[in-house]
Amino acid sequence: MQSPINSFKKALAEGRTQIGFWLALGDAYSAEVCAGAGFDWLLIDGEHAPQDLRSVLAQLQVIGAYRDCHAAVRVPSADTTVIKQYLDLGAQSLLVPMVDTADEAAAVVRACRYPPGGIRGVGGARASRWGRYPRYLHEADEQVCVVVQAETALALSNLEAIAEVDGIDGVFIGTADLAASLGFPGNPAHPEVQDAILDALQRVRAAGKAPGVLTPVEDLAQKYLAHGAVFVAVGIDTHLLAKQTSALAARFAQVAYS
């Protein structure tokens, strides 16, 4: 059996636009509903969503049945043990939060690579199909997509250095935490924050790496794409469910009491 090729990593390297969707429900059943929707990629959120290793595994399994949809996973932190566990589950693309410096980015890359280029521990796991991919240890490093999140003022000051780290495939701008870091908590739409986001997208692209971002606002998604974003998540399952169920209930409440 041949180790799988990471189509998402290839698309980022080629600068091909990838439209995605955020999974925060922590549920494989709803993840499969989204996997068939037509998105290029889905992000399984292990930082803010109620996840554990088994819930992430279940979502990787159901999304894996949809060949045109790639599963990426956000780890809860840059902890090397956590990164190893998520990679062993079979995640090929990781999003690592709160990376502020080039040294931190380089440490993330090392955690994702086997020796001698890194420190990832070797063990029989789903990623190698329990040894059925005979060359997995030799091929895995080239197929792991490493994306780090720049989401503080400090990260923006180090953006080029972070992007230029060998092994970093993309830099994702975390708009909510960035807004808080810049003094506008809860207001990523503030003009100063938006200017910083657009500037960051262009700087990452100029450094030769793929910039990414998340927004459930369609006009902003289009703006980010126009300013160089390569991979954009255009919605969140929890946000969409809350918004649409509230709107539906409100419409029928008006009918009931009219």
Swiss-Prot record:
The record marks R74 as: Transition state stabilizer. The record marks D88 as: Increases basicity of active site His. Pathway: Xenobiotic degradation; biphenyl degradation. Induction: By growth on ethylbenzene or biphenyl. Its EC number is 4.1.3.39. Gene3D superfamilies: Phosphoenolpyruvate-binding domains (3.20.20.60). Belongs to the HpcH/HpaI aldolase family. This is 4-hydroxy-2-oxovalerate aldolase.
